[in-house]
Swiss-Prot record:
Possible transcriptional activator. The gene is foxi2-a. It holds the Pfam family Forkhead. One of its GO terms (cellular component) is nucleus. One of its GO terms (biological process) is cell differentiation. Keywords: Activator, DNA-binding, Nucleus, Transcription, Transcription regulation. Signal peptide: none annotated. SUPFAM superfamilies: Winged helix' DNA-binding domain. GO terms for molecular function: DNA-binding transcription factor activity, RNA polymerase II-specific; RNA polymerase II cis-regulatory region sequence-specific DNA binding. Localized to the animal hemisphere of early cleavage stage embryos. Zygotic expression is restricted to the dorsal part of the epibranchial placodes of the head within a region located near the tip of the first, second and third visceral pouch. This is Forkhead box protein I2-A.
């Protein structure tokens, strides 16, 4: 127990003492190894550096944009701290970009340009040529400008257009001549000068209001459609009705039918003329003839293996005597049409009438030749 109590508190203390003894015996080996290997820099002290040994953070986050991130470190030549790199490591290096005299760090810390005006010269304004013309005209008290005055306004307010004037000036002229929103106004007699004035069409002023100059010009079809009178029934009539006219009987019937079709939904549409009365009279005659055909059925006579259709022809002749309405008066639509067969019994009757003949009419009975 006493031997355990005499051990040092650190369990690795004995190992460190043993390693120190072995290192003393091999001191010659260490001297030879130090002669062969290059001299390593001394390790920095364990206590750390003082606050005065650290440099201020670089003003630019990128090393290649004129920042002092390379030459201002205390670890390079001339630093107050411990020389981590050998002397002369960064002495022959140079900055990637030369320092700029007018660099605005507060405005653009990531871009090396003289000032903000140079940036505006490189960026094209997000406006079309017609929008630029409208802006120039609206910013004048007289609301009219000559071509040269429009050029001057664009060049003064947008530095991008100060270069290569030939290109955008041609576009300005084309927009003035092809766009319907711009109107040419002649000069007055008391106004000397060269060139006509250009003004903005009053119908197109809403396209450039509230500083929104990016909207496209309105199509001609929309402007024409806006002037159409929706309450005019004369314009809504088809060409066929206009050509027939209301004087001719065909035109009167078609107009009557078109007025029936044009009735508003939700209201009952009355049938045209006496079509309902004719259909009811036709159905009455049809039902009476069919009842007579079914109840007073006569025995069939067969000759030469074929049926005798004389009676059937008689009843069919009576059915065809029903008056048919005029084809000029078309029947009403499905929603308001009077049903020709209102009951189920009449539907069955119609089915039997539509097929009055069976196979027995066409073929002889069994055993009869």
């Amino acid at each position: 127990m006493n031997t355990f109590g005499q051990q040092p508190t650190n369990p690795h203390a004995q190992d460190l003492l043993d390693m120190a003894m072995y290192c003393d015996h091999f001191s010659l080996y260490h001297q030879q190894q130090n002669q062969q290997l290059p001299q390593r820099p001394a390790a920095p002290p364990a206590t750390g550096y003082g606050l005065n040994e650290y440099s201020s953070p670089p003003s630019s986050p990128y090393l290649w944009l004129n920042g002092p991130a390379i030459n201002s470190s205390p670890y390079l030549n001339g630093g107050s701290g411990s020389p981590y790199f050998p002397a002369g490591y960064g002495g022959g290096q140079r900055q990637f970009l030369p320092p700029s005299s007018g660099f605005g760090v507060a405005d653009f810390p990531w871009l090396s340009i003289p000032n903000q005006a140079d940036l505006l010269k490189m960026v094209r304004p997000p406006y079309s040529y017609s929008s630029l013309i409208a802006m120039a005209i609206q910013n004048t008290p007289d609301k009219k400008l000559t071509l040269s005055q429009i050029y001057n306004y664009v060049a003064e307010n947008f530095p991008f257009y100060k270069k290569s004037k030939a290109g955008w000036q041609n576009s300005i002229r084309h927009n003035l001549s092809l766009n319907d929103c711009f109107k040419k106004v002649a000069r007055d007699d008391h106004d000397p000068g060269k060139g006509n004035y250009w003004t903005l069409d009053p119908n197109c002023e809403k396209m450039f209001d509230n500083g929104n100059f990016r909207r496209k010009r309105k199509r001609k079809s929309e402007s024409v459609g806006a002037g159409f009178d929706e309450d005019s029934n004369e314009d809504k009539k088809p060409l066929a009705l206009k050509s027939l006219g209301s004087d001719s009987p065909q035109g009167a019937s078609v107009l009557e039918q078109s007025s029936y079709d044009a009735a508003p939904e939700g209201k009952s549409k009355a049938p045209v003329g006496s079509a309902a009365q004719d259909s009811s009279h036709c159905f009455t005659n049809f039902a009476s003839n069919m009842n007579a055909l079914i109840n007073n059925r006569t025995p069939r006579q067969f000759t030469a293996g074929r049926g005798d259709f004389s009676n059937s022809r008689h009843y069919l002749a009576e059915l065809t005597s029903c008056p048919i309405p005029s084809p000029q008066i078309s029947a009403p639509q499905t929603g308001s049409k009077v049903p020709c067969y209102p009951s189920k019994q009449q539907n069955n009757l119609c089915t039997s009438v539509m097929n009055p003949f069976g196979l027995n009419h066409l073929y002889s009975r069994e055993g009869e030749v």
